[in-house]
Amino acid sequence: MERRTPWLCVILSAVIFGCMPLGANFLYAQGVTPMSLVFLRNLLSLPVLALLCQKQGGLRISRGALLETSLTGFFGCCITPILLFSSYCYLASGMATVFHFAYPVIVVLGGLVLRERVQKKALFCAVLCSLGILLLIDPSGAVDPLGVALALTSGVTYAVYILLLAHFRHREVMGFRMTFYMALISAVCMFFLCLFSHQLCLPQTLAGWLAALAFSLMICIGAVMLFQKGTFLIGAQRAAILSTFEPITSIFVGILFLNETLTPRILLGSAITLVAGVFITLGGKKDEE
């Protein structure tokens, strides 16, 4: 069971992230802007994360760990969600998520650039995932070039985040402390960005605030921490490929809750992506054995 834990962490993280557009679109209807949503996502998780840190030995962190956490958090919890959430304003959430998922291939290519050992099966799975993701794109849907550019760029910045996470040196702070400081630094940066760009728009109803709190806790304490734990143990390439469960979740959430249709193309794309995910998971277990 312990060997399966990191793989399950990444998959569960992807499923939670896949439900993210539902919460984002609800909060947009409450008057929240994409930049404000990133700010709230990080800010509202801080009290709970601080309490959890106290149970794990406190908030003390070295300067080196803080600098590395700041850089990692900037890409993972600041710039990536700004780009992705902004793309939801121009594209259907499912399509935006699909374009965002250029990053498994980028991570594998990044591994080659960093002269990591890239296994042939990882490269094959990345190509297979890309094929599956392309099939999930609705060719009849309206595609806004700005939305596509935002979503694709979010994939690039997220790939950088995964590579930074996999090579994170100060692993003594992994867990609640790392997540707390990533959220804190991102919240401070986003507050000033929202102020200077006049994008600080908060929920106007109690339901909006409760939704923002639930959104924050699910993402920062649920999905982000699960993804960190899994990536530390199985590496950037496998984590990126397994994360392709996210667009599948987004599409099926849309079918179940947003009255979107299920087509043979979607079924085929989902099946190919799932096969790639299962293949890389089983291959990883054999390597460990």
Annotate each PLM feature.
Residues 27, 37, 41, 87, ...:
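Hydrophobic/aromatic residues within transmembrane alpha-helices
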